[in-house]
UniProtKB/Swiss-Prot annotation:
Any one GO BP annotation for this protein: phosphatidylinositol phosphate biosynthetic process
Protein purpose: Converts inositol hexakisphosphate (InsP6) to diphosphoinositol pentakisphosphate (InsP7/PP-InsP5).
Catalytic activity from the UniProt record: 1D-myo-inositol hexakisphosphate + ATP = 5-diphospho-1D-myo-inositol 1,2,3,4,6-pentakisphosphate + ADP
Protein name: Inositol hexakisphosphate kinase 2
GO CC terms in record: cell junction; cytoplasm; fibrillar center; nucleoplasm; nucleus
Pathway assignment: Phospholipid metabolism; phosphatidylinositol metabolism
Subcellular location: Nucleus
Keywords: ATP-binding, Kinase, Lipid metabolism, Nucleotide-binding, Nucleus, Phospholipid metabolism, Transferase
Annotated control of activity: Inhibited by flavonoids, including myricetin, quercetin, luteolin, isorhamnetin, rhamnetin, kaempferol, diosmetin and apigenin.
InterPro entries: IPK (IPR005522), IPK_sf (IPR038286)
Length: 426
């Protein structure tokens, strides 16, 4: 058992873990919360849960590690602010949802509960029965304000935030990342609206892919030429088809769903949301990709080789997956935006690229290369709420062969990154 998991010993059921907004969420509509430094938490969708439980072994290094299931409810703190608190599931004897499937993560890697204060452990508090009645007027006003903020977010498709040189980047973004706060507030709103009928939800625990980076730069790409699942209503399917037709999804099988990148030249973080991503032309998509790998001073060329290597391997893996369809799934590309002295000069960057290729097999973690002198870079698939394959017995539609739309998007991505690499002089 790794030290990260060994630290989380069995905890009495009266304890809960305070869930916080995940400040590096740049896309998607599902609320992603921070469980602890290395673990995230998101609402359990049966289809996505089934995907992680039956995940093919060769795909594990391209997805976040699955860590189990918890029960989440909202409660008030001392200042009457609403908080989301996670608890172990009933009957799990302190361990977070043991899974018996042989294709899953080993039981030894599933999270256990602890009293360690740094994990934000709270005592259980009873939720006031009259909460809805007391706060109805107040919450109505907040809801109206929230709608105004979301409309502003749609209009402000690209935002900049100046990062202080001293201090932790995650703590600075805690109350700023617009997309993260939007998703968190929407989740609270949904749970509050159902307060009379339900105050207990299942969430899944997943690896925090950004935890190893000091200044995470994150690119969220919506993959494939089709986004709607087989179970989508006619209205939903038509809406998703329209979005694909009006974006780069229909042309190259991929579009920008969100971006967070550090501009070292100005000391700012740039955020790009999905509304801007939908408007990009193919050339605009290429420029956005170039911007993601550019730190405001120079192109991070030492990252391009490792990214291409990972994309090529992922493509080969998916070509072997029979009947899978990853509708509406995203692909994350992550690297550290922190400047490193040895990559300031172009000649140094070229040398580091050679080093990164030589040390590619010395990967740390699931699939994050950590070459000498260069930032590690990660490529992972996420969001499987609409994924299907013949293993899912309840599905009425069974597809044959590989997911051609997703693979087409991967090949387009490989081609564009290759173009950027060649045009930059490599």
């Amino acid at each position: 058992m790794s030290p990260a998991f060994r630290a989380m010993d069995v905890e009495p059921r009266a304890k809960g873990v305070l869930l916080e907004p995940f400040v590096h969420q740049v896309g998607g509509h599902s609320c992603v919360l921070r469980f602890n430094e290395t673990t995230l938490c998101k609402p359990l969708v049966p289809r996505e849960h089934q995907f992680y439980e039956t995940l093919p072994a060769e795909m594990r290094k391209f997805t976040p590690q699955y860590k189990g299931v918890v029960s989440v409810r909202f409660e008030e703190d001392e200042d009457r602010n609403l908080c989301l608190i996670a608890y172990p599931l009933k009957g799990d004897h302190g361990i977070v949802d043991i899974v018996d499937n042989s294709d899953c993560e080993p039981k030894s890697k599933l999270l256990r509960w602890t009293t360690n204060k740094k994990h934000h452990v709270l005592e259980t508090e009873k939720t006031p029965k009259d909460w809805v009645r007391q706060h109805r007027k107040e919450e109505k006003m907040k809801s109206h304000k929230l709608e105004e903020e979301f409309e502003w977010l749609k209009k402000s498709e690209v935002l900049y935030y100046t990062v202080e040189k001293k201090g932790n980047i995650s703590s600075q973004l805690k109350h700023y990342n617009p997309w993260s706060m939007k998703c968190h507030q929407q989740q609270l709103q949904r749970m509050k609206e159902n307060a009379k009928h339900r105050n207990q939800y299942k969430f899944i625990l997943l690896e925090n892919l950004t935890s190893r980076y000091e200044v995470p730069c994150v690119l969220d790409l919506k993959m494939g030429t089709r986004q709607h699942g087989d179970d989508a209503s006619e209205e939903k399917a038509a809406n998703q088809i329209r979005k694909c037709q009006q974006s780069t999804s229909a042309v190259i099988g991929v579009r920008v769903c969100g971006m967070q990148v550090y501009q070292a030249g100005s000391g700012q973080l740039m955020f790009m949301n999905k509304y801007h991503g939908r408007k990009l032309s193919v050339q605009g998509f290429k420029e956005a990709l170039f911007q993601f790998f550019h730190n405001g001073r120079y192109l991070r060329r030492e990252l391009l080789g490792p990214v291409l290597k990972k994309l090529t391997e992922l493509k080969a893996v998916l070509e072997r997956q029979e009947s899978y369809r990853f509708y509406s799934s995203s692909l994350l590309v992550i690297y550290d935006g922190k400047e490193r002295p040895e990559v300031v000069l172009d000649s140094d960057a070229e040398d580091l690229e050679d080093l990164s290729e030589e040390s590619a097999d010395e990967s740390a973690g699931a699939y994050a290369y950590k070459p000498i002198g260069a930032s590690s870079v990660d490529v992972r698939m996420i969001d499987f709420a609409h994924t299907t394959c013949r293993l899912y017995g309840e599905d009425t539609v069974v597809h044959e062969g590989q997911d051609a739309g997703y693979i087409f998007g991967l090949q387009s991505l490989i081609d564009i990154v290759t173009e950027i690499s060649e045009e930059s002089g490599e």
